[in-house]
Amino acid sequence: MFASCHCVPRGRRTMKMIHFRSSSVKSLSQEMRCTIRLLDDSEISCHIQRETKGQFLIDHICNYYSLLEKDYFGIRYVDPEKQRHWLEPNKSIFKQMKTHPPYTMCFRVKFYPHEPLKIKEELTRYLLYLQIKRDIFHGRLLCSFSDAAYLGACIVQAELGDYDPDEHPENYISEFEIFPKQSQKLERKIVEIHKNELRGQSPPVAEFNLLLKAHTLETYGVDPHPCKDSTGTTTFLGFTAAGFVVFQGNKRIHLIKWPDVCKLKFEGKTFYVIGTQKEKKAMLAFHTSTPAACKHLWKCGVENQAFYKYAKSSQIKTVSSSKIFFKGSRFRYSGKVAKEVVEASSKIQREPPEVHRANITQSRSSHSLNKQLIINMEPLQPLLPSPSEQEEELPLGEGVPLPKEENISAPLISSSPVKAAREYEDPPSEEEDKIKEEPLTISELVYNPSASLLPTPVDDDEIDMLFDCPSRLELEREDTDSFEDLEADENAFLIAEEEELKEARRALSWSYDILTGHIRVNPLVKSFSRLLVVGLGLLLFVFPLLLLLLESGIDLSFLCEIRQTPEFEQFHYEYYCPLKEWVAGKVHLILYMLGCS
């Protein structure tokens, strides 16, 4: 029998869901309430069952919006440890949520479209506009002063329309909470652009111009993950349509494009990126606050790489973050890729759905600015989650410093929407080119993985001083041993040798009796002995194979394939080379000491 429709009012929106329900009490107890916060801060609530999968909830939200280009979006939730997660479509919602119902989730943009011009429907562009608006307010979208003023003017034009002196007082911009920190200078510039440059633009046009400007910025689409690098410096990792990016302060210090990313993996709290730089393989390591944060970072990287890199979803394979001898986590992105989404959008032939815009004017007192970025990690100015995001996703804590006004630099390009459209029609060939402003310039630096790992250089003379040969008393004393002493030592040596031979015969006889069954042994000891023998045999086989792979110059195809795997390179650089240098140093020291003697 069918259950009645559940329609729960929340905010300004409601949502209807129909599901099967039996008349048993057990079935009724399996119903769970779920609240989803939308991009305009309204909420919808529904009831789900224990077996309901994540895709069911995503589809119902998209049906509520009448959204067809839904592959850009996802649902995010937070576990009791304040760790964020993306709801997986193919898994049960109940099994993914580690809290008791009712559940609270957020509907957000998961994959940012690389080319806003290829978005077919106005509804999709409006939802992306709301996400960009949130990113601007939360401090995730860094930009110059002129770009910030233009983005703010687009938001004002989209929500208020043309400037009207009768309706808009002198300080009308101060009623809008657009940026984490708005100066009067920035507000005056927004008013100037709103009055003179955007007049006559409808809300869809103003929103589209904002997307054209935002997608040219370096931090467009970056969801920052706070980490520590090998030197202990706080960095923010992100994934964009171009590739894997690393930020320190207000600058992008590293970019590896998706075709050059060989593998993403994690072990405990350490996240590894193995990629190609100038035809040479390099491995970057970053440390997160918890293993759960590291796994979330890895899964986000795997999904973004699959979405932006591949031409077809059939090319996506299951990825394993495995160690050399142990099985690790396995994960596979199950959605469409960017090219498939664009192709599907081009085939949409329906009448565009009506877009219900919410005219939201946020007051400055509606948000608290006293939340901390992440537990046990020092916050930085760039890419900080917003106060409202922290209320949804992160624990309470101390205040977060906000970007200062003097950190906003001179304009980079004109704020004219016509010029912005022209810039999009002729985009730069490389994302890291044509960046010329300070101090918010995001500059591409040459990455040297050994620069921060090697100790201070030491001269050869100083190294030799570390291995000074000590004086030996044997060289200074005379040979005073007599013939009688030497003969006595020889007799003692013969006696000791005979005793050792007797012990060896007894050990061999005992081993033979055990093998033939004349002596009964504990089965546990016998199993352990067999395991020890097998382990020694494998060691005798694996050790020569490793030497063959590491030291020989044999150019066989299967040996080359093994040498080129990221796991083997990690073992070679992190374990084998240090061990080899240590052994070589000890041998060099012994030979040097023997040479001195």
Curated annotation (Swiss-Prot):
One of its GO terms (biological process) is actomyosin structure organization. Keywords: Membrane, Transmembrane, Transmembrane helix. This is FERM domain-containing protein 3. It is found in: Membrane. GO terms for molecular function: cytoskeletal protein binding. Putative tumor suppressor gene that may be implicated in the origin and progression of lung cancer. It is a single-pass membrane protein. CDD domains: FERM_B-lobe, FERM_F1_FRMD3. PANTHER family: 4.1 G PROTEIN, FERM DOMAIN-CONTAINING PROTEIN 3. SUPFAM superfamilies: PH domain-like (SSF50729), Second domain of FERM (SSF47031), Ubiquitin-like (SSF54236). The chain crosses the membrane at residues 531-551. One of its GO terms (cellular component) is membrane. The lineage of its organism: Eukaryota, Metazoa, Chordata, Craniata, Vertebrata. It comes from the Eukaryota. PROSITE patterns: FERM_1, FERM_3. It comes from Homo sapiens (Human). Residues 383-403 are annotated as: Disordered. Ovary-specific. Residues 32-312 form the FERM domain.
